[in-house]
Amino acid sequence: MGKPWLRALQLLLLLGASWARAGAPRCTYTFVLPPQKFTGAVCWSGPASTRATPEAANASELAALRMRVGRHEELLRELQRLAAADGAVAGEVRALRKESRGLSARLGQLRAQLQHEAGPGAGPGADLGAEPAAALALLGERVLNASAEAQRAAARFHQLDVKFRELAQLVTQQSSLIARLERLCPGGAGGQQQVLPPPPLVPVVPVRLVGSTSDTSRMLDPAPEPQRDQTQRQQEPMASPMPAGHPAVPTKPVGPWQDCAEARQAGHEQSGVYELRVGRHVVSVWCEQQLEGGGWTVIQRRQDGSVNFFTTWQHYKAGFGRPDGEYWLGLEPVYQLTSRGDHELLVLLEDWGGRGARAHYDGFSLEPESDHYRLRLGQYHGDAGDSLSWHNDKPFSTVDRDRDSYSGNCALYQRGGWWYHACAHSNLNGVWHHGGHYRSRYQDGVYWAEFRGGAYSLRKAAMLIRPLKL
């Protein structure tokens, strides 16, 4: 039997090899053996990671080669930059040489011209004298200045060209954006365009041969006037029509008054411009003192198209126009007046044939601005037809304050502020079209549907209010 320690060594070597093959944790062992004399072969078994592999060597060499290639690429790029710079310098040198040759040729021409002016005997080598030499130097300086100015102009042209290209690109971008927005507006879900239905139109009402009363005729048109288109304007503001027997000159009796009815009770029986105290302000209004007992405050008048009623909320709130012509008293002043007590409303109408009509409401008031000056009306009486009760309890709407019941903007379609529903049976603040019947995409005239229909623009209209208790 052999030596026991030798067998133990062989067993340990076999166990180490099996553990390495089975993926056991790698360990190192140190064996101290007594000196022996071996006659056979000695074998070694250990983990494969202790021996160098060709793949590791190839990876390190590849990394080194990549580093060298990277350095060479950097050198090549640097050489390319230097070559480009040299090319630019060479181009500038060629341009300077060309410019120098041009200047030399120009100087030669100038010298020849000076020699020609000096006389026929002066040759190329002749002495031109001090004065021609000074002139030549001056011309040379002018040439240099002109060249410098040309270079500056070229630089400015280049800058302007760059700016023009930038602006052209910006315009192109904005045009494409506008086109895209036009395709999307008014946009709905999924970017699909929502097409709003056209505003409802009032059916054309047959002409009603309504006889104009004497009071209405005196109020709206005491004397014939020339018809004017809406594009024509008067040179002088037209005075409001006056009853017969009184000069049509605006007057300002002593005031201010609470309303026109108070001025009437104080003995002022002439119609004209009066000053009323409305809240903390004093406003000028037209008081009609001879129509149905007087005391009427004119809050709206249309007669010649001299005032544009297609305006904003603030203008309708404060008022605009002149009280002795076309004007709108203002939503806030009317609210202040009607908040003092019960009022009645009288609407006077006249067509282009001189026929007049009236609509009377035994109750009229406006709510405050917090409720958008909502309209409150009483019972209707008259011969014009009731085209305003449909607007009862409706807020006032303008092009910039859309309060109507329509999905679109009635004030935009009908070109004026009004107590719109969806949209209107009347609108006395529309466009003053000349001649009655008019052509327009929408019903945007001065109309009262029950009197001449929605496609007929009236010649004159007025709205007057008065306290019920005089």
From Swiss-Prot:
On whether Coiled coil is a keyword of this UniProt record, the answer is: yes
Q: Where in the cell is it found?
A: Secreted
Q: Which GO terms describe its molecular function?
A: signaling receptor binding
Residue ranges that the Swiss-Prot or TrEMBL entry lists as coiled coil? 59-116
Its GO biological process annotations read: angiogenesis; blood coagulation; cell differentiation
Q: Which residues form the Fibrinogen C-terminal domain?
A: 251-469
Q: Which residues are glycosylated?
A: 58, 145
Query: Disulfide connectivity?
Result: 260-287, 410-423
Ordered alphabetically, the record's keywords are:
Angiogenesis, Coiled coil, Developmental protein, Differentiation, Disulfide bond, Glycoprotein, Secreted, Signal
UniProt-listed Gene3D superfamilies = Gamma Fibrinogen, chain A, domain 1 (3.90.215.10)
Region Disordered: what ranges? 214-249
**Quick one: signal sequence residues?**
1-20
Query: Which top-level group of life is the source organism from?
Result: Eukaryota
Q: Which GO terms describe its cellular component?
A: collagen-containing extracellular matrix; extracellular exosome; extracellular space; secretory granule
Q: What does this protein do?
A: May play a role in the wound healing process. May promote epidermal proliferation, remodeling and regeneration. May promote the chemotactic activity of endothelial cells and induce neovascularization. May counteract high-fat diet-induced obesity and related insulin resistance through increased energy expenditure.
Q: Which PANTHER family match?
A: FIBRINOGEN ALPHA CHAIN (PTHR47221), FIBRINOGEN C-TERMINAL DOMAIN-CONTAINING PROTEIN (PTHR47221:SF5)
Q: What is this protein called?
A: Angiopoietin-related protein 6
